[in-house]
Amino acid sequence: MSRTQRTNEGRGRLGSVLSGIAVALGCVLFLGGFVWGAIQYQPYTVPTGSMAPTIGSGDRVLAQRIDGDEVRRGDIVVFEQSTWGDLPMVKRVVGIGGDRISCCQDGKLTVNGKDIAEPYLLDQGEAAVATRIPATTVPEGRLFLLGDERSGSLDSTAHLTDGENGTVSRKAVKARVDAVAWPMERFGMLERPDGFSALPGGTSEPGPLRLMAIAVVAGMVLVLGGAAYGPVARRAGRRRAGSGTQETAGVG
C-alpha cells in the first residue's frame, strides 16, 4: 500500500469519526431543543382580536409556563378567571399589587402617577381616550389587565364593579406569551415594552424560546452535514482512485 493510499484511508477514518460525532451531537441538540420546548411552552390559539395589533384573532402563540409570582408589568399572559369566562384569556398586565391605575389624561395610561408609553397600541390617542379608568388601586397579589385593542376588549375595565376592582389573582395566570407561531407573516418573538421599565420591579426577561430555536436549527444542520459526509467522501474517494489509476497506467 502506498503512502498516499494510507494517508487517504486515515483521512477517511477520521472523517467518519467526526461525521458520527456531528450526527450524535446534532440529534442531542435537535431532540433536546424540542423536549425543552415541550416542557417550557404551551401553544394557544387566541380566539378574538382584543390584543390586536400585537396578536390577531386566530393567531397561534407560544406561551411559557410560569408561576403567577413571576409576572411583571407589560407581560402578555394567559389566564383563567371563572367570572370572566370559561376559556383561557390573553391580556396585557398593566398593573400589579399596590399600583394606582388611571386613564386617560392627555391620552395616556398612568401607573403610580407616571405616564406609560404604549407603542403597541394601534391608535395611540384614540385607543387610550376610549378607555376611561377612574383612579383604581390594585389589591396585593392581583393584576390589572387590559387588551391592546382598547375599544373592543373585555378586560379589567369591564369588571371594575365586580369586586377586587376588576383585577385577577396572580394564581390565575397559566403562562406568559413569548412569540407568535402562526400565521407565518406574524411569526416572531414579542418585544418587551419599555414603558414600564422605570417602575419598581421593571419588566420580565425574555424566556428561553430563542435558545431552544437555536438548538433545534443547529442540531438539524449538524445532522444533515454529518449524514452528507459519507456520500460526499465516497464520491471524492472514487475520483481520487480513478485519477491514481490513470496516472499509473500512463507510466512506462
Residue ranges and their predicted role:
Residues S2-F30, G37-T45, P53, S57, ...:
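Soluble "head" domains of membrane/secretory-pathway proteins
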